Each structure stands twice: as C-alpha cells, then as structure tokens.
C-alpha cells in the first residue's frame, strides 16, 4: 500500500512539473492554463519492440540497448507495457525456445495489443522464411490462443512477410458515450497509450463541438481523429500517403457506419496543389474538392513540427487543431500562427509518464 501511495505521489509530481513546463513555453502566446490529462502510471503502452539475444544452444532473452552507450539490458518484465504484453512475453519465449524453426535467426519480436484484449506478434528474422516456418508458427499461434484468446502471428524477413490469418488487431475506444472500433495494422503507426488516446479524442471532440462547415485533416493515419470528430462537422476530408493506413481508415469508416468522411491517398503538398487547381489527379476523379467548406484543419505532425510552407498554408483556416508531440517545435510554429490566430484552449496529455516527453493540444481561432 505504501509503495502504491509513493508511486502515485511521484507520478503527480512529474505531471505537475510537465504542466509547469508547458505553461512556461506557451506563456509568450497568451495561452490559457493547460487542461491536464493524467495517464495510468504503468502498463499504459499497447505496443513494444524487443531485440532477441541468443546465448548457447537454447537460451533466448528480450533485450534493449542504450542508444548512446550501446549497453545491453535484459528485459524480464516491462512495467510500462500493457498487462497482456507482460503475460505474453515469458510464455512466447518458452514456446519458441523448443522449436528450431521459430528460433533460428530470430532477432526481434514486436507486440501490438489492444484495450479490447487482442494481440498481434511479429517475429523478425535474419533469414528467408522457408516452408517449415508457417506450420510451426501456426502451432505457436494455437498454443497462445488457448491461453490468451485473440492472438495473431506475423513473420517478417528481408523482402518477405507471412501472415497466418490477420496482420491487424481490432481496438475499441470509448470516446464520450460512443464506442469506436479501429483496425490497427502491423508495422503502421498507432497511438501507443490507448487510455491517453481516448482522452485526446474526447478533448478534441469537445473543443470542436460548435464548429461550422467541414474539417480537413492532414496525414490521418487509420482515421484515429477523423472518425471521432466526424459528428461535429458536415463533412471530413482527410489525407494519408501510407497504403496500409488508408486501407485501415476505409475499414474503420465502414465498420463505424460513418458516412461523411472522405480519405484521399495523397501528400499535403499534393492536396494543396489539387485544392488550388494547380494540378489534376486521377485519384480525385468523382470528388469535387471545391464543394468542401473546410473552415477547420487538424494537424498532428512528427517531432520536427510543421515546415514553413505548411504553417503558411494552415493559416488560411478559421480554426486550427494542432496536436503536438514536441512542445519546442510547436512553439516555433506558434510564433507564426499566433500572428493570425489566438490560442483559445490548450491541453497537456501525459502520453509517456516518467519521461520528458510531452504531448499537447492547441486550439487556435482566427483573430
């Protein structure tokens, strides 16, 4: 009990420090006090990647390496990982140890799990997977399913991928009073902290509740935000360049019975060219871009933030929802954006507790 209280106190302390840091960073832009969303202190990561270390004839271990010193660390448990990842880890190695086909040249194992209790395990090899691998992997999957329920296995090697049944999991997220189902595809980006993702989607839905017109989202992934926000807009136009993510987004639109979201497989630069009538694209046949009244834009850039051209482009919109995984590059972008827009609301999402990482959201409205 004492440890639990101590751990909670430490968690609240680090969360408060992040809140102070974000408040200081946003102060030059006259931002309101950030709304703060806490994470579960442990078992919050729904995905993990481990290198596999071979010792002797039969021994296998999960390891991680220090990125600077290259020192090797054995991983016997993973407290930040989901409960399901931690339950799967020892049993999976136990089953692989006794099978030469599965064990030989195995160098990495990736886990993808869901709040809904599903798991996808990717086995990565420094060898070509021969005809013996698939039956061995099928037997492995059957053993795991007997103990853990909905588990799928994928094998990958150089220019080779073997999918036994599914290369995805189906997640169910609670957003307000709605349950949304999301296909999450192996080796594609998904939000790692599912509990925090639910809170992010809830906040984004709340800040856009009174919006008029249509929404544009750049690089929508599997439709994570677009689907949750669709109810607040007449229509949603979303761009994405990765084929697996586009496929997942189309599935998610259909399974959630959402009829006002259009996914375009194109880059932000291509979309801007199409919207300005500078270039025609065959993939846009039958889609009248000029009929959209996109007053609101959603951007969720990588750590590098938005490039100057994209910053200039999004300034044309009445409202901007900016989800950031790096407050420094967010602030760099805000130096330009706040020339034309005010920060109406902002939030801190503690995506990765006990790290320096800060996820944040900023809702900008034209002056």
From Swiss-Prot:
A Pfam family hit: tRNA_U5-meth_tr
Where do the annotations place S-adenosyl-L-methionine binding? Answer: 191, 219, 224, 240, 300
List the active site: 325, 359
- Could you say which residues form the signal peptide? none
What GO biological process terms are annotated to this protein in UniProt? Answer: tRNA methylation
Is Oxidoreductase among the key words of this record?
no
Family, according to the entry, reads as follows:
Belongs to the class I-like SAM-binding methyltransferase superfamily. RNA M5U methyltransferase family. TrmA subfamily.
Say what the protein does.
Dual-specificity methyltransferase that catalyzes the formation of 5-methyluridine at position 54 (m5U54) in all tRNAs, and that of position 341 (m5U341) in tmRNA (transfer-mRNA).
* PANTHER family linked to this entry: TRNA/TMRNA (URACIL-C(5))-METHYLTRANSFERASE, TRNA_TMRNA (URACIL-C(5))-METHYLTRANSFERASE
Output this protein's name. Answer: tRNA/tmRNA (uracil-C(5))-methyltransferase
- Its source organism is Tolumonas auensis (strain DSM 9187 / NBRC 110442 / TA 4)
